Amino acid sequence: MRIAPSLLSTAIVAALLSAPVVADELTGTLKKIKETGTITLGHRDASIPFSYLGTEPGKPIGYSHDLQLKVVEAVKKELNLPELKVRYNLVTSQTRIPLVQNGTVDIECGSTTNNEERQKQVDFSVGIFEVGTRLLSKKTANIKDFDDLKGKNVVTTAGTTSERLLKAMNADKKMGMNIISAKDHGESFMMLESGRAVAFMMDDALLYGEMAKAKKPDDWVVGGTPQSFEIYGCMVRKGDAAFKKVVDKAITDTYASGEVNKIYDKWFTQPIPPKGLNLNFPMSEELKKLIASPTDKAAEQM
């Protein structure tokens, strides 16, 4: 039987449109993932409850990581790769941006603030969290606000927005603080717990996470006037619009379905590993607004 040329052409076009995406049509991160069959997720080791190592060696858990896994599922569907392999790559505050830039990590979801300076180096997904920058201290230290830190040892984590803010405050107000920059949040809290610092400046949600894993959580308090409000986002390589589109849709679909509320409650209002403690950190009005109206803007651009 002969098929009319016009019908044959129509059939060919239809077949092409319905065919799975092939690597030759892809660019950037999606092409890399399609060709290797692997996606590499950047994660933290101690950013409780966002991204941190659980009981299974080398495998992260946390609020941000759960959203990162939603991206993995979206990529599987987009590329028709049901057997997509997931590789985990540990990052720190200092290495997270370079490892995204050089292709070692395809996407980093942890506790990374989206700001204008970082936007020059990487692209950010729509926001996944909003925090205020505050202080963690021992209740007996009687640290009520930042003015109480004059002449004292204060710790923060190297390579973070908090480190930059604390150093600027120290210089501008001539507070005479001795600022200790620890390699990660776990080390920052160790400095605080051991008495080498009287306060730990960081994002409030992370401070609650550190407090939850303390030997005696009730000995500690989060306080101080927030010095900044910041939005966390997942980092991807700059200019990779196709991959960012998949990432953003995976996150906003999780928001629209309401599943984000279950994920939030799992990590902020219920017992979490490693000690089964509850952060008792209800969702803020700022985060509710961010979920209702997602944006990839930094807080200072709002």
UniProtKB/Swiss-Prot annotation:
One of its GO terms (cellular component) is outer membrane-bounded periplasmic space. Keywords: Amino-acid transport, Periplasm, Signal, Transport. One of its GO terms (biological process) is amino acid transport. It is found in: Periplasm. Residues 1-23 form the signal peptide. CDD domains: PBP2_GltI_DEBP. Its main location: periplasm. Binds L-glutamate and L-aspartate. Belongs to the bacterial solute-binding protein 3 family. This is L-glutamate/L-aspartate-binding protein. It comes from Pseudomonas aeruginosa (strain ATCC 15692 / DSM 22644 / CIP 104116 / JCM 14847 / LMG 12228 / 1C / PRS 101 / PAO1).
